[in-house]
Amino acid sequence: MLVWLCGLCLVTLAGGRSAARLPLTEGRPTADFLPGDASLVEELLFGTGDTIELSCTTPGSSVSVVWFKDGISVDPPTWSHTGQKLLKIINVSYDDSGVYSCKARQSSEVLRNVTVRVTDSPSSGDDEDDDEESESANAPKFTRPEWMEKKLLAVPAANTVRFRCPAAGKPTPSITWLKNGKEFKGEHRIGGIKLRHQQWSLVMESVVPSDRGNYTCVVANKYGTIRETYTLDVLERTPHRPILQAGFRSNKTVVVGSDVEFHCKVYSDAQPHIQWLKHVEVNGSKFGPDGNPYVTVLKTAGVNTSDKELEIQFLRNVTFEDAGEYTCLAGNSIGYSHHSAWLTVLPPAEPVPDVDTSVSILAAAGCVAVVILVVIIIFTYKMKMPSKKTMNTATVHKVSKFPLKRQVSLESNSSMNSNTPLVRITRLSSSDGPMLANVSELELPADPKWELSRSRLTLGKPLGEGCFGQVVMADAVGIEKDKPNKATSVAVKMLKDDATDKDLSDLVSEMEMMKMIGKHKNIINLLGACTQDGPLYVLVEYASKGNLREYLRARRPPGMDYSFDTCKLPEEQLTFKDLVSCAYQVARGMEYLASQKCIHRDLAARNVLVTDDNVMKIADFGLARDVHNIDYYKKTTNGRLPVKWMAPEALFDRVYTHQSDVWSFGVLLWEIFTLGGSPYPGIPVEELFKLLKEGHRMDKPANCTHELYMIMRECWHAVPSQRPTFKQLVEDLDRVLTVTSTDEYLDLSVPFEQYSPACPDSHSSCSSGDDSVFAHDLPEEPCLPKHQQYNGVIRT
């Protein structure tokens, strides 16, 4: 039972356990515990199935009381009153959690407030076990209070909001979210909520004015409870017609009898009206006299239809009559939006007729005979090869064969062993030194799928070079197999005459890596190779607009603080949507590389190339990089190291994962929205190490929304596992791209000079910054100014 004795609150549970205890003061109760003072709210934690007894102390013994739960008078049959001053709750459950208060029946004065929280029942045990557990156990505490300093958050409608309460305790505490004092699970919120318990966060996408209020996180275990409250204010947006998420226009082709789903995600400040329509023909015509199409309504809003149900159109066991055009139509008081997709229904595949057994036996025997004949021919040919080779290379003093080992970033569970020889190269040279005196004397096995005759390749102007390799523009005839006479502009990677065996190994390794990765729109794809009768040429896609960093800098709007050429107008003015599109395309490319188990390790704007039609393509993902023998504090002869793009675990522990690539992607986002700015401008490398360890991060760029900056900060999470995946980044950026206006130009008053390096870039004669294709070390060391210049771009 529960009794009040001089300030002592002892709640007795079934079995005689004490759930919570308040301090006891000898003699008279202190002012904090006077019966008439309800300013103190006791918090009590119970397990499911317990029995709770709550008492209410009154000024006089004859005063009767009334009990309330969350402000509502309660008296269910499972509860009992003893003189109405003792409330007993039997076999408690989660629903019994809440704020209990008692009032004098003839008065509105609250005599007592008690918050009851019900969690999973702790395992029972003897007193000794409890004592041992209590020695190592502790109450919850917030682990990152600096993340919780901003208590008031004001955002425009349709943005994404995240509240975080990172905490720790033993046993691991639970977290519950309240909105305006009541438990909040988002059941009645359009779009719902995301509760990420591993990140101790509450996420609400596409917020609307009705989301305003106070949000409280309650973190508790059986040793204590802590809470923190945030205030959210949602600013009204300009009304607009419904916005339909990109991606619906995906035509479907299925076999008759299959099930089909069409999805239509709708964003609207005003309540939208959603309909699914199927286009039909009337008297052989698809359109009426007024020019509008004939349609039949498949699904529309109803009393018992939820928004989520309306966003999906199911077609069960489709027939040929179901084929045709389907449209999702969404409207509100401002206007209408619609997307359409086609459904094609195919007949089932005809079963293969049974073949006579004797015919099968004869066919099998014929195949075996052909295989045996081919083996004999190959064996005979191999036997004759040594004598021919000896005759052709009689003047060679030394023949050296070495296997090329993969040095690319593939995860250990890849289907290819990282030490598997990919290509065996015969080096024919009269020199015993380590240099290749004549690259043309190398012999590589031809790959028919990729081999291109040198006669069909016309080399053009140089595009860039490094210490050991160079890239030139060229015209290749016959790259497109279906157009054998068409010339295509390509970029050709090749070695210099003084390249070493390792340089050749790296270039061949990159070529083989690109073969294995496959093709994607947002990566630089392999087009072919010249491996016979001359030096090794690797043909890749040509990006006419150069790398993304210089592309953005060339398009900075002119202004009084423009630090480059104030007399030169930018080639074209970028909109905010253009920048989001750049980020989205790079995320798509990285999502594909991650799906192929490829870790880039040097993702930055300088390693993203831009084609003539503004397609972003990730480059240098197949490079061999020695990440274990680099001194990050020293400049090497191969250029500068990219410490400003590296995740802390890669920088300090040499650990490279997809999560470290996500960190680099966050820095690349910052580069995009500063139009090619240099990260951490004016921060010396030694100071940068210290700032990163202390949790400091770059501030929000001027032309970046709060939502996109939150994506950057998520990429820069100190714990790699709590950073978003590239798949999640693609989804987030797709949503941002969908709701972004196409005519939202950048703020011309922003001084982009603040994002420029504090000292000029200094390239060595062998800098790999321009030609990282042949770099053995990672390119680009941060610029080291003489004086620290923070420029207000570092924040905690």
From Swiss-Prot:
SUPFAM superfamilies: Immunoglobulin, Protein kinase-like (PK-like)
Source domain of life: Eukaryota
Pfam families found in the cross-reference section: I-set, Ig_3, PK_Tyr_Ser-Thr
Expression (tissue specificity): Undetectable in the adult skeletal muscle. Low levels of expression were detected in the liver, lung and kidney. Medium levels of expression were detected in the heart, spleen, intestine and eye. Highest expression is observed in the testis.
Protein name as it appears in the record: Fibroblast growth factor receptor 3
Catalysed reactions listed for this entry: L-tyrosyl-[protein] + ATP = O-phospho-L-tyrosyl-[protein] + ADP + H(+)
Compartments in which it is found: Cell membrane
Activation and inhibition: Present in an inactive conformation in the absence of bound ligand. Ligand binding leads to dimerization and activation by autophosphorylation on tyrosine residues.
The family this protein is said to belong to: Belongs to the protein kinase superfamily. Tyr protein kinase family. Fibroblast growth factor receptor subfamily.
Database matches in InterPro entries: FGF_rcpt_fam, Ig-like_dom, Ig-like_dom_sf, Ig-like_fold, Ig_I-set, Ig_sub, Ig_sub2, Kinase-like_dom_sf
Residues at the catalytic site: 602
Xref: PANTHER family: FIBROBLAST GROWTH FACTOR RECEPTOR 3, TYROSINE-PROTEIN KINASE RECEPTOR
Alphabetical list of Gene3D superfamilies matching this protein: Immunoglobulins, Phosphorylase Kinase, domain 1, Transferase(Phosphotransferase) domain 1
Keyword Signal in annotation: yes
Extracellular side of membrane: 20-358
Residue spans of biased composition, Acidic residues class: 125-135
UniProt membrane topology term: Single-pass type I membrane protein
Signal peptide: 1-19
Keywords: Apoptosis, ATP-binding, Cell membrane, Disulfide bond, Glycoprotein, Immunoglobulin domain, Kinase, Membrane, Nucleotide-binding, Phosphoprotein, Receptor, Repeat, Signal, Transferase, Transmembrane, Transmembrane helix, Tyrosine-protein kinase
Residue ranges that the UniProt entry lists as topological domain Cytoplasmic: 380-796
Transmembrane segments: 359-379
Location of the Protein kinase domain: 457-746
Molecular function GO labels: ATP binding; fibroblast growth factor binding; fibroblast growth factor receptor activity
Annotated S-S bridges: 56-102, 165-217, 264-328
